[in-house]
C-alpha cells in the first residue's frame, strides 16, 4: 500500500503522463506472435513466453543443454502488448473488424445520430476540450436486416470473428511437442463439451445454440473477437468507471489499458459521474476488448438521480446513444418485477444491486410493472440493429450469505429465462448475470438452476463471495466462489477488487482483482479439463524443479511480483541460478534433495546392473564368447 496519498491533481497528472508516454510493451522474455486464418485480415495475437534451456550434463567447461519450448498464452492486451505498434490514444486503435463489417453489406452509415442526448452533446462547444477528436461515424443495420453474430450463426455463416475466436481459444497448443508439457489430468466438466480442437464450425454451432455469445457491436470495430460460453475458456470481466466524487477521463483510460494488460477479457464502464458520454467514447476508441455498460446509470443521471422520474423514452434514448458509440453489451435489469419486490422485505440486506434498487423504487413509486420488462421487445429491436448483446441483470441477487438462494433471487432467474427466449426471437445474443454472496455448499445449485431455467445461455457471476467477514480481502473471499462456479460451468467471472464494499478501486486494486480472478478462471479450466489448460502449469513445474528462476518469474501470471518477492531475500544475480530459495536454504531444499535422490538412484541402478553382469560373466567361466546353446 502506498505510503503517500496523491492529490486529485497529482492522480490526474500521473494518468495523463501514462497516456502521453504509452507504447506497446511486452512482458519479460515474451514476444507477440500472430497466427493467421483463412479469412482476410484474421491475424490472431498471442503472447509467447521464451524459456531458457535445461542443463542436462557435460562439464563446467562444456555444459550440455536441452532446449525448452516457448509457451503460447492467451493475450487480451491488443496493440498495447505489441512493441512494434505505435500507440496514440488521441487517435484510438486501428479498426480491425471494419473490413469484415463492410464486406457483409448489411449496414449503413448514419447521417444523423438517433439519440437526442448525443446530438446535444455534439452541439455543445464547451465540451470540445474533453471530446475524443476522431469520433466514429456510426452504423446500423439496413432496414429489415439483422447484424448479430447469432443471426449469422443461425444462417450457417462462419464469420471472420468466429474463425478468429477458434484460433484464439486453441492458444497455439498444437505447437507444443513435449509429452511432459502436454500431459493433463482428466477433468470433471459437469456436462460441458470440451473438444480437443476448437474449430470455427464449433464456435458457430455454440453461438447458434445460444450457449455462447460474441460481444461485438458493429460500432466497436477496434475490438478483437472473443467468446463467452461454458464450452470455452473461462473469461474475466473488470469494472472501471468514474463516480460523482472521484476519477477522470484520463484515469479511466489508464485503467482500461491496465485492465487489458492484466488479462481482462471484457471491461464494464460503470461511470456515474460527469462526462459519462465523453469518457465512454475515449474508452471505446481505445479498447481492444468488448465494453459493457449498465444504461440505467446514465439514464438516471439524465433525470438528476431521481429514480421516480425515469421514463422509457429517456432510457430508450440512452440505449441508442450507447449502441451508436459502440457498447458491446448492456446489463438490463428487466427481471425485477413489481411482484418480486415484497419478497426481499425479510432479507438481511435487501436489494443490493444498484440497477435492481433503482427499478424496484420506480416500480413501487408508480405501482406499475418494470418498464424495462414492458418494453423488452423494443430493447431487443435496438440491440439487433447494432449487435449489442444483452447481459440480463440479477437485480435481486443476494448481498449477504444469509440471503443466498432465496425466493426473490430464483423468481427473478425464472423471468430471465423467459426474457432469454424473447431475445433469441430477435437474434439477440444473451448471457445471464448471477450472484453475489453464496456460501460454498450452495454455489452449485445456482449453476444448475441457471442452465435449467435459462436454456444454457452463458452465466456471468460476481464472485460469488463465500463469506462476509473480510472487507479489504473480498477479492479472496469471492475468488474462492469464482473458481468453484467457473468449474461448475460459469462462462465469465466479474472480478472483485480489495476495495469491494469500501470504495472506488484504483489502478493497483484493478490489478489485484484481475490477478485473483485469472487464477480462479484458470483453476476452473484445469478442473473442467479444458484441453491444453495444464501446459503452462507443467512448464512452471519443470522450471521450478530445474531451478530456472527467470523462467519461473516469466511464466507467472504476475512476473514482476514473483521476481520482487524472490529478490527481497536473494537480490544478487547469483540468486537467479541458485539451487535453493530463502524458504529452505541450500541444505533443506526438497527439490534439490529430490534431484540428488534421482541422480543417486540412477547411478545405483547403473552400478548394480554392471555388478550383476560382472558376476554373471565370472559364473560362466570368464569366456568372452559362449557356445550358442549357452547364450
UniProtKB/Swiss-Prot annotation:
Cofactor or coenzyme needed: [4Fe-4S] cluster
Reaction(s) catalysed (UniProt annotation): 5-amino-1-(5-phospho-beta-D-ribosyl)imidazole + S-adenosyl-L-methionine = 4-amino-2-methyl-5-(phosphooxymethyl)pyrimidine + CO + 5'-deoxyadenosine + formate + L-methionine + 3 H(+)
Pathway: Cofactor biosynthesis; thiamine diphosphate biosynthesis
Binding site for substrate: 239, 268, 297, 333, 353-355, 394-397, 433, 460
Enzyme class: lyase
Residues that, per the record, bind [4Fe-4S] cluster: 581, 584, 589
Statement: the UniProt record of this protein carries the keyword Cytoplasm: no
EC number: 4.1.99.17
Cellular component per GO, a single term: cytosol
Alphabetical GO biological process terms: thiamine biosynthetic process; thiamine diphosphate biosynthetic process
Binding site for Zn(2+): 437, 501
Record's keyword terms, sorted: 4Fe-4S, Iron, Iron-sulfur, Lyase, Metal-binding, S-adenosyl-L-methionine, Thiamine biosynthesis, Zinc
Cofactor remark from the record: Binds 1 [4Fe-4S] cluster per subunit. The cluster is coordinated with 3 cysteines and an exchangeable S-adenosyl-L-methionine.
InterPro entries (alphabetical): ThiC, ThiC-associated_dom, ThiC/Bza_core_dom, ThiC/BzaA/B
Molecular function GO terms recorded: 4 iron, 4 sulfur cluster binding; carbon-carbon lyase activity; zinc ion binding
Origin: domain of life: Bacteria
HAMAP family named among the record's database cross-references: ThiC
Functional description taken from the UniProt entry: Catalyzes the synthesis of the hydroxymethylpyrimidine phosphate (HMP-P) moiety of thiamine from aminoimidazole ribotide (AIR) in a radical S-adenosyl-L-methionine (SAM)-dependent reaction.
Family matches, as NCBIfam families: PRK09284.1 (NF006763), PRK13352.1 (NF009895), thiC (TIGR00190)
Record family assignment: Belongs to the ThiC family.
Subunit and interaction comment: Homodimer.
Name the record gives this protein: Phosphomethylpyrimidine synthase
Species assigned in the record: Escherichia coli O139:H28 (strain E24377A / ETEC)
